Every structure is written in structure tokens, then in C-alpha cells.
Design a protein with these regions (language model features):
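A conserved FAD-binding loop/helix module that cradles the flavin
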Residues: 428-450
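FAD-binding beta-loop-beta segment adjacent to the flavin cofactor pocket
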Residues: 337-342, 395-424, 428-430
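Dinucleotide-binding Rossmann-like beta1-alpha1 core, especially the glycine-rich loop
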Residues: 50-129
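Beta1/beta-strand and adjacent pyrophosphate-binding region of the FAD-binding site
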Residues: 2-16
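Glycine-rich FAD pyrophosphate-binding loop
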Residues: 11, 25-48
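Active-site/ligand-binding neighborhood in enzyme catalytic cores
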Residues: 105, 119, 123-245
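Mid-domain catalytic core of redox enzymes
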Residues: 27, 235-384, 392, 464-468, ...
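A short, Lys/Arg-enriched amphipathic alpha-helix followed by its capping loop at the start of a domain
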Residues: 20-29, 228
Length: 474
């Protein structure tokens, strides 16, 4: 086997690809990163317009992985601040605390509804003790852990708004991983005894954040790579040529033309569905068929510049109700006061969509008008206060975890794993719901494997990604 890894081509300039590139560059390897967008970062980028800054939905950084935490803190230096997480759920024309606070829920939903929630939860737990049932869908899992009433009140509407399909079609494997270990009982316990996220990472009270937006992490990674390597934005990968389960070259194209480049190792964080279709010769039919069945959810972000110092005091506001077209709001100035000019603020609304649907195809003016009208109806702003706007469409923002997705992914993993110099990584690359820290760790661990391979030795079992010298550049 060829253990040389002097030239590494990284296909995708999101957090995973950039983290891999940074670690590999610091280890002295030659790196080229290709990103189809005009800017690096993927979904973790910050948009700047007229002195206002906003992320594509707001992305917090929180991790329990010491190495990833050190990697980001070392990278960002003095740019990081600590932010308190304060979130609300807008439901039935009321605001509820998230995480759940029992008294808030009791007075908000009313005692009869609260009693019904607790009774349903108790009944589900008793039913589970008598006969365990298979939890195939999100609906199965949530009803088992929260009860039918809570599912109908909150989880059903919000989940179907976010994912665009019925809860019975959303995989339980995803939701179990996403809010692992969380149940109604634990949420109530957390409300009375604050853990600050120690035991329930999805309920972390504080997180770190760059003063100028989450995109600064991607920008700093790019700067590190470009000390000796190359990051090419606006450059699309169109083909991967292979022989004997070894990638031999990649065809890339940008405004200057196309080129075929050779590398020793290839890291792909692009959507796994795109990767499979780019392989030349084409994969077997059953592999192409599996890839065609995996789908992504798209995102449209509408940001409104507002002539007011502050609108809310929240990190996020979740809106499950179907009569409101967006699913979440955040106010970047509550994350960092440098995200808007003095005396002004900015509100960001997230519209979940499928590419080609009415939301995706609506023009910017229509989307802006829709956001303003609904925010005004909710009592947040007045139309006269809006002094500017921006609309950003993010295709393939989130893998869509339909029932059966894992079996499809396993087919692709098994096939792609046969290529000796191809490494798939990241959220879209692995078709997994990675938070920021997972995306970064995926890049670090992929880089570690390549570094060990280039040194002619395999990483010990379970030690991938633990190369501190490569991570910290020392």
C-alpha cells in the first residue's frame, strides 16, 4: 500500500474540511481545500451587511471533548466570549421556558393539561414495564419518553415543521441520539436542580462564541491553512476518477475553467450523495440507488435590520405552531453586542424548506414581507422599524433522517470504505447530525488517520484524533 500522503485534496470547506486541513497543514503536509461557495464555513458562516452581522441560524459552540475545546480556544485566542443560553418556546400564544420549568409549564398550559401530561407519561412508563415496544419513529420515541399529550402539544408540530415530513417517518435513531438520555422526568429534574449541562448536554446553560460571529472559526481555520496550503473558494468538484478502489484524480471547475488534479489522499466532507454520483467509473446500481434515497432539508434565512437597541433578551425562540411559517428566531446582538451597530439590532428567522418548494422559490421581497408581517403579528417589531434585510438560501443544510436511513448509509459506508485513500467526514459527508464540536472533531480525527498513515504506522485502536502536537501546532 502507498503510505505517502504528501498531497491531500480536501473536498468541502466547511468546519470539518477546514479542521482537517488545519491539522494536516500544521503537521507539515501539503493541503488543498476546494469549496464551491464564495466563502468558507458551510452552514457555520457569518454574513455581514451594512454593519450588521448574522449567522445562518445561530450556532453555539459547546463541547465535552477536552481536545476539541482546546483546539478552538487555541485557534481563536482572545476572540471568544461566554454567552448565557436563554431560550423560549412560543406555544398557544404564550412563552415557555426551555429547558422546561415546571411552574412555568403548569401556569402556562393550565393545571388540567399538566395533569394530563403527567398521567400520559406515567401510563407510557407503566406500559413499557409490562411490554417493551420497538421504537422505530420519532413519534414512537417521544411518546415513550414524554407521553402522547406532550408529543401532540409540542414535538409533533415543531418536528414536522423542521423536517417537512410526518413524525411517523422520522427515524427514532436520530432523535434518541440528538437528545440522548433526556425524558420528561429528567427535564423536570433539571429544572429543579441546575446541572449547567454537565449531565444533559442538550440543555447546556452557557456556551462560547466568537465576538464577530461563528464564521470567525472557519475564517481562522482558513488563515491557518493558507500559511503553507491553499484554499480555493468558488471552486466546485465535478468528478473523482478511480481505479482499483483508489482515487487517482479530481476534476474541479471555477470561473477560470476546469482542471484535473492528483492527490495522495482525499478527504470528502461534501454531501455523501454528491460524492457517490461523482465517482467515475460509476458505483454499482444498488449503491447509486441507496444514495438517491437519502434526502436533505434545506434552509432559508431571512434577517431583518431593526432600528431599536434590542427586541428580545433570548438566545433562541422556538415556534412550533404551523400558522407561523418560520421555526426559530434569534437576535445576534444577544450573543455579541458587536453583531449590530450601536442603537440597532437584527432579528434572524429560519424557514425550513425543500429546494423547489414555495418557500425556496419565493423571491427575497416576498420572504422579507412574510417575516416582517409575522414578527409584527407576534408583537416583536413594527414594520416601520425595519431598516434593511437580507435573505440567504442554504441547500442541503440538514440530513433528513427518515426511517431506514441507517441501512442506506451502511451500504454507502461499506462501499466507500473500500477506497484506500478516500476519507469521508463531517455532517453531510457522513450523513449524521453533527453539532459544531462533532464536525470539528470529525475533521481532527480524519487528519490524524492521514498523519499516522503518512508516518507508516496505524493509530492504536480508539486513539484516532488524539494527536495533541498536530492539533495545537506544537
Amino acid at each position: 500500500m502507498n503510505c505517502s500522503a504528501n498531497e491531500i485534496l480536501i473536498l468541502g470547506g466547511g468546519l470539518t474540511g477546514l479542521s482537517a486541513g488545519c491539522v494536516l497543514t500544521r503537521a507539515g503536509l501539503n493541503v488543498k481545500v476546494f469549496e464551491s461557495d464564495a466563502e468558507v464555513g458551510g452552514l457555520s458562516k457569518t454574513i455581514e451587511k451594512d454593519g450588521f452581522r448574522f449567522d445562518l441560524g445561530g450556532h453555539r459552540f459547546f463541547t465535552r471533548d477536552r481536545q476539541v475545546d482546546e483546539f478552538v480556544r487555541d485557534l481563536m485566542g482572545g476572540e471568544l466570549i461566554s454567552v448565557s443560553r436563554t431560550s423560549k418556546i412560543y406555544l398557544r400564544r404564550r412563552y415557555f421556558d426551555y429547558p422546561l420549568k415546571p411552574m412555568n409549564a403548569i401556569f402556562g398550559l393550565g393545571i388540567p393539561t399538566t395533569v394530563r401530561i403527567m398521567a400520559d407519561y406515567g401510563a407510557e412508563k407503566a406500559r413499557g414495564l409490562i411490554k417493551a415496544s420497538e421504537k422505530v419513529s420519532l413519534e414512537d420515541w417521544v411518546v415513550s419518553n414524554f407521553g402522547r399529550t406532550m408529543f401532540n402539544i409540542y414535538f409533533k408540530e415543531y418536528s414536522e415543521k423542521v423536517w417537512g415530513i410526518d413524525c411517523s417517518r422520522i427515524s427514532a435513531e436520530w432523535v434518541a441520539q440528538r437528545i440522548k438520555g433526556l425524558s420528561l422526568a429528567k427535564a423536570v429534574k433539571n429544572a429543579f436542580f441546575k446541572f449547567s449541562g454537565k449531565d444533559l448536554p442538550t440543555l447546556a446553560d452557557r456556551f462560547i462564541y466568537p465576538k464577530l460571529g461563528i464564521g470567525r472559526i472557519s475564517e481562522r481555520l482558513k488563515e491557518e491553512i493558507e500559511k503553507t496550503g491553499d484554499v480555493r473558494t468558488g471552486t466546485r468538484v465535478e468528478g473523482l476518477y478511480h481505479s482499483g478502489f483508489r482515487i487517482e484524480s479530481a476534476k474541479v471547475i471555477n470561473h477560470k475553467g476546469s482542471a484535473v488534479l492528483r492527490g495522495n489522499e482525499y478527504v470528502s466532507s461534501m454531501p455523501i450523495t454528491n460524492l457517490v454520483r461523482m465517482l467515475n467509473p460509476a458505483p454499482p446500481g444498488h449503491i447509486l440507488d441507496a444514495a438517491s434515497k437519502l434526502k436533505f432539508r434545506d434552509l432559508v434565512v431571512v434577517a431583518l435590520m431593526v432600528d431599536r437597541e434590542r427586541v428580545t433578551d433570548q438566545t433562541w425562540i422556538y415556534i412550533p405552531e404551523q400558522n407561523i411559517p418560520f421555526g426559530r428566531i434569534h437576535e445576534p446582538k444577544n450573543w455579541s453586542d458587536q453583531m449590530a451597530p450601536e442603537g440597532k439590532t437584527i432579528l434572524v428567522t429560519e424557514f425550513f424548506s425543500f429546494r423547489g418548494d414555495a418557500i425556496w422559490n419565493a423571491d427575497d421581497e416576498t420572504l422579507t414581507k412574510t417575516a416582517v408581517e409575522n414578527l409584527e403579528r407576534l408583537g416583536f417589531i413594527k414594520n416601520s422599524e425595519v431598516i434593511g434585510s437580507a435573505v440567504v438560501r442554504a441547500a442541503k443544510a440538514y440530513p433528513l433522517f427518515e426511517v431506514g436511513y441507517k441501512e442506506l448509509c451502511d451500504k454507502l459506508y461499506n462501499y466507500l470504505g473500500r477506497f484506500e485513500n478516500l476519507h469521508i467526514a463531517g455532517r453531510a459527508g457522513m450523513f449524521r447530525y453533527y453539532n459544531m464540536d462533532h464536525a470539528i472533531e470529525s475533521g481532527i480525527s480524519t487528519a490524524a488517520k492521514i498523519i499516522e498513515k503518512s508516518a507508516g504506522c496505524a493509530a492504536p485502536e480508539g486513539e484516532e484524533g488524539r494527536l495533541v502536537f498536530a492539533v495545537n501546532g506544537r
